[in-house]
Amino acid sequence: MTAPILAAAVFCITVSVVQLTSVAIAVGRFRRSGPSGPPSKLPSAVGHFPSVSIVRPLCGIDNYAEETLSSTFDLDYPHYEILFCVASAKDPVVPFVKTLMADYASRSARLLIGDDRVSPNPKLNNVVKGWRAAHHDWIVIADSNVLMPPDYIERLFASWRDDTGLVASPPVGCRPDGVWAEVECAFLNTYQARWQYIVDTFGFGFAQGKTMLWRRGDLDAAGGIEALGKEIAEDAAATKVVRGAGLKVRLVNRPLAQPLGRRSAAEVWNRQLRWARLRRASFLLY
């Protein structure tokens, strides 16, 4: 066997072993997650069902917006408030949210409008007012296109430990409409999610901006919500803030759904390209 053939064989075997091992670890994580549904108690590091503030930054109306946003009101958790954040009063999502709030009038929900320029990141600028207005010490920042299951908050708390500074969840793409949405599902649900769970299993978890559970004091000790403006992406800054405090980012064992709907080739390509550039800018080795 010539040297090039031997090298190619070793490379193929190594890659196959790495791939199969990564799949086995990811599958093992999901199987350990247990049955769905609200637990009878939360980890000791959390306490007995503490009150939670959910901050949802909005911009425009996403695919499946009625379902994803209304899911915020249907959580099976005893004490939580909802803060919808919009940068402009002219955003078409404003009347949409007002209608939802009227339909769920028994829930504690507020719509906050305004643009606080604390960073070059428009999402973070939108979130700031929600963070400042939150009544509770446990705060979830969740993108508008996350579909929240009834046990959403319990699912986040279940991963919190004494050494945790943040719990996040990678998105699981679902309900694709068309070939390019299928491509994005394939990326989200295989390569991206799998490798995030690999590094998390070994204690090197990365924040994912789709959903982030914070304890207010941890972020305030690092300079407050404005500290997330130190990087181009708020989740990259979150990872560095948590690690800088000697704490860990952890992922939920059962990731959260993101309904995709229709996608064009350009949308998928541009999104993946933007994420790749953000990763390279914030974490050069990754």
Regions found by a protein language model. Give the residues of each.
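Catalytic donor/gating beta->alpha subdomain of glycosyltransferases that bind UDP-sugars
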Residues: 160, 166-192, 217-220, 225-286
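Short aromatic/hydrophobic "clamp" motif used to bind/position activated sugar donors
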Residues: 127, 139
